[in-house]
Amino acid sequence: GISDGETSDFSLDNKYALESGIYIANQQTVSDKISLQYGLRISMFNYMGPGSAFEYFDDVTPGLRRGVASEEEFGRWETIQQYINPEPRFSIKYQVNKSASIKASYNRMVQYIHLISNTSASNPLDVWTPSTNNIRPMKADQIALGYFKNFKENAYEASVEVYYKNIIDLVDYIDGADLLINRFLEGDLLAGDGRAYGA
């Protein structure tokens, strides 16, 4: 015979956030050979209720989840945490001749949504989470330098470019972190700095 099966429904509370921003930019020709582009974006991110916000103990023991120090309930539309960040960008172009140019640029980028990915487990798992009172937005400063060459009256372009990126508050997790249906996921997360470079 067939026995009645039992099922359990596990789910986590939804998280709510609102992101907004303004951006201004300008393009300026300095001379026949030099042109500039520059701008500024101001982004604002609000992590909001309804929901619970946790505060964790500051002490970090390698490989162990931080303990919950307190829990506070927030109502609908109440701001739990707010972040405001300037994101400047600047680029300069030097026209070597009609078909070749050199470009240099700087960008500050801020990311408020984080992908917590565990690809080493037997069942790969991706978890998306917004920036919260415990997870700061990730910031990246990138500089780049490139040489660009057009061919056949600008029908084709070839280029080589090098870049360096410095990353602040890069999110990672402790060894043995529980990413699946974990109400206290933030206690398993770490923030660090990183860098990337290439061509």
Where are these regions (language model features)?
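Extracellular loop and loop/strand-boundary signature of outer-membrane beta-barrel proteins
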Residues: 5-12, 25, 72-78, 127-133, ...
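Flexible, surface-exposed loop regions and adjacent strand-edge segments
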Residues: 1-8, 52-64, 117-127, 174-184
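Membrane-embedded beta-barrel scaffold of Gram-negative outer-membrane proteins
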Residues: 95, 101-113, 117, 134-197
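Signature of Gram-negative outer-membrane beta-barrel scaffolds
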Residues: 1-97
